[in-house]
Amino acid sequence: MKNKSVEMLIEGAKEWGIFLEMFHVEHFQKYYALLLEWNQKMNLTAITEESEVVIKHFLDSLSVVKSGKIKEEEKIIDVGTGAGFPCIPLKIVFPKLKATLLDSSKKRITFLEEVINKLGINEIELIHGRAEDIGKDIKYREQFDLSMARAVAPLNILLEYTLPFVKVDGYFIALKGREIEEEIENSQRALKELKGEIEEVKEIKLPYSDIVHHLVIIKKIDNCPTKYPRRANAIQRSPL
């Protein structure tokens, strides 16, 4: 990456209270290079310009620390991780996180295997599968301190895919856009059914841009009923 983009990354991260060393920067540079290389043969991201990737992928992912819920050595799962956002940037900065990245695309998982090998990232598991299936597996169900999703699905649908992974007293963090009030209003039934409650909604303004988004921080207050998550077609056809 060019010096200007590196400076944007370093200074932007400081706004989240993160102080990057040069080895962190080198990891982000390798990640960016791999993203560009693999994006030529598969659809990973429409955002490829250097400064845009820094702002809309790297700094956006790191903004999760503003939730106050990122703690070293905790177990986290990134549901529908895509090209690795937000979890790979978080693992670069917080290497002791015990991370699981879940995606339904085998091609994207293959890309992520290359990323973690080239970056030398440890304590990370990649799963090729669907959240509605893996969320029923006792190896993963209610095993995580924190789940995250940056997916574009409405919040009430995301909750059914993500909350079953979270331990009681753990958290789900949804990275959502500027307009969030209606989604929250439409998620009240899902929150009640899936045993979650909104603890806080944080407004985040991304550095070097006019982009505003929100972190919706949801606490798991009891075990999810075993009937959730339902099959994907049921979730889409009749969302909670």
Swiss-Prot record:
Keywords recorded for this protein, A-Z? Cytoplasm, Methyltransferase, rRNA processing, S-adenosyl-L-methionine, Transferase
Gene3D superfamilies referenced in this protein's UniProt entry, alphabetically: Vaccinia Virus protein VP39
Among InterPro entries, the record links this protein to: rRNA_ssu_MeTfrase_G (IPR003682), SAM-dependent_MTases_sf (IPR029063)
Q: Where in the cell is it found?
A: Cytoplasm
| A Gene Ontology term for the protein's cellular component | cytosol
- List of residues binding S-adenosyl-L-methionine: G80, F85, D103, S104, S105, A131, E132, R150
| Entry GO MF terms | rRNA (guanine-N7-)-methyltransferase activity
Query: Which EC number applies?
Result: 2.1.1.-
Which family is this sequence assigned to? Belongs to the methyltransferase superfamily. RNA methyltransferase RsmG family.
Function text:
Specifically methylates the N7 position of a guanine in 16S rRNA.
**Protein name per its UniProtKB record:** Ribosomal RNA small subunit methyltransferase G
Q: Which organism is it from?
A: Thermoanaerobacter pseudethanolicus (strain ATCC 33223 / 39E)
